[in-house]
Structure formats: structure tokens, C-alpha cells
Amino acid sequence: ATFTIRNNXPYTVWAAASPGGGRRLDMARIWGRTNXNFD
């Protein structure tokens, strides 16, 4: 399977809930997030 991941938000996506106050997401993590908006 091939997954194409695109960050539509105009900034780097960070996992704010990670220990240490957040870290850069790697390709192994996929968030259901579009245009940097949360529902």
C-alpha cells in the first residue's frame, strides 16, 4: 500500500501532547487533519 501524506496547514505539524512539549511528526504518524483545522 502507498500512502501520500500532505500537510495542508501553513506550518509544521507538531504533536503537542508528546512528552517534552511536542516534537516533529515523522512519516510513521498519520493524523486525520485537513487544512490545519480540528473538528
From Swiss-Prot:
Asked whether the keyword Translocase is assigned, the reply is no
Stored InterPro entries = Osmotin/thaumatin-like_sf (IPR037176)
Q: Does the keyword Zinc apply?
A: no
According to the record, the signal peptide region is none
Q: How is it modified after translation?
A: Contains intrachain disulfide bonds.
Q: Name one GO biological process term.
A: killing of cells of another organism
Q: Which UniProt keywords apply?
A: Antimicrobial, Disulfide bond, Fungicide, Pathogenesis-related protein, Plant defense
Q: State what this protein does.
A: May be an important antifungal protein.
Regarding protein family, the annotation reads: Belongs to the thaumatin family.
Q: What is this protein called?
A: Osmotin-like protein
Recorded source organism is Hevea brasiliensis (Para rubber tree)
Q: What is the lineage of its organism?
A: Eukaryota, Viridiplantae, Streptophyta, Embryophyta, Tracheophyta
